[in-house]
């Protein structure tokens, strides 16, 4: 099964996605983390998510770019969080795919889907935070 969980910032989508992933299988679980720890705010959010996942049986795999290189356990339940961060990383990181970001992400998701039993994907609802965006932001959206 593949599920997409979307919502605004701090909307509870992470907790919902974790609960869904846990309910899908008692087998191996893998959390693919895409947020880079750029600053104190990011590090604090990452720590909160780690604490929230504690005791739920998730192995964590950090993957900031190149999702197709991520190798979760066969037949596992994978929680990919979050596609919005992954897109920003692919578009703007020096080691990202740049203009090939969409293709890189789609291929990465396809690769995960072939390998895992269940895939839960988390993404931000990008238009919940405003309606007027500059050129680079529109390209990202």
Kindly give the residue locations of the regions a language model identified.
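General N-terminal targeting signals
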Residues: 20-22, 46-48, 78, 95-97, ...
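Conserved P-loop
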Residues: 2-73
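Short, functional N-terminal and low-complexity linear motifs
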Residues: 12-19, 77-78, 110-119
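Short secondary-structure boundary segments
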Residues: 8, 35, 82, 123-125
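Generic beta-sheet signal
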Residues: 3-5, 29, 76-85, 117-121
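Helix-adjacent hinge/juxtasegments
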Residues: 51, 56-101
């Amino acid at each position: 099964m593949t599920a997409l969980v979307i919502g605004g910032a701090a909307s509870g989508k992470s907790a919902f996605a974790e609960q869904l992933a846990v309910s899908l299988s008692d087998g191996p679980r893998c959390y693919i983390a895409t947020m880079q720890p750029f600053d104190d705010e990011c590090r604090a959010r990452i720590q909160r998510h780690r604490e929230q996942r504690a005791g739920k049986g998730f192995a964590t795999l950090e993957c900031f770019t190149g999702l197709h290189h991520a190798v979760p356990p066969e037949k596992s339940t994978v929680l990919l969080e979050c596609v919005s961060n992954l897109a920003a990383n692919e578009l703007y990181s020096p080691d990202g795919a740049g203009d090939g970001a969409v293709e890189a992400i789609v291929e990465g998701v396809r690769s995960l889907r072939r390998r895992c039993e269940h895939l839960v994907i988390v993404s931000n609802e990008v238009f919940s935070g405003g309606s007027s965006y500059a050129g680079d932001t529109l390209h990202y959206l």
